Amino acid sequence: MSTLVGALREALSVPQVTINETVLELHSKDESYHQAVKPEVVVYPYHAQDVSNMMKVAQTFNRPIYPFGLGTSLEGLVIPREDGISVDFSEMNNIIEIKEKDFLVTVQPGVTRTQLNNELKKYGLFFPVDPGADATMGGMAATNASGTTSVRYGTMRDQVRNLEVILADGSIIQTGSSAAKSSSGYHLNGLFVGSEGTLGCFTSITLKVYGIPEHIVAGRAVFPTVHDAVAAVVSILQAGIPIARVELVDEASIQKVNEFSETTYPVKPTLFLEFHGNEAG
């Protein structure tokens, strides 16, 4: 292990590579109930070349790589299966460029959803994918994150225009471009988004963004059965009503919401809805 750590520190720098027990413990788990497994070493890259250099060392020593954002996953995705390198992208947290006229933004993987939207707000823009947790853009792209807004805006795969990816041999590739449509080459964005770190590490992500709606209206509807609630959503979509968010909550979950938040919602299947629009419609 000392040889691996020494090679990593030589390829990056001493402060970027740690085997501190507390840090290893923090990178041994996420928000899931899966058993924690400590990585062999934790690396903090500052830029794409750091990741490339680290990948080359990992390949030399035949060690697996485990990209780590904020550890908000509920599926155990960041937990090592065996000794390897946990790559913490928290230091790569810059918003590289906002092209407000093209409705595009390029970010490093450690940028969080809240951080991004706070900056986009200055331009009258927002990023719509909302998985609930304040995850990083790298983690959201790696897991093809979705949320209650997917009914209108789609999932993470629908937002990604380009990825800068470091492959296992340390080579750096671009998977797309800024173009809205291209028939040139394979659809590599679709391959890498949702790959959960198995094909490479993302070091920059170009995303579509949207204008902030003039009006946002929320609503709640209660139904006698889950089947009735689902049928209502189908009818709404078939009618072409531009719903922006929808979430179905069953009786058991409503009961827990009432207990935790001291609310008095009827304990019935419930739809929580949101609509985006403006004065003109």
Q: Whereabouts are the PLM-identified features?
A:
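Soluble FAD-dependent oxygen oxidases
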Residues: 37-65, 104, 147, 171, ...
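Terminal amphipathic helices with adjacent charged low-complexity linkers/tails
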Residues: 249-281
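Short amphipathic alpha-helices in soluble, non-transmembrane regions
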Residues: 8, 58, 232-236
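Short beta-strand-to-loop capping motifs
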Residues: 46, 221-225, 273-277
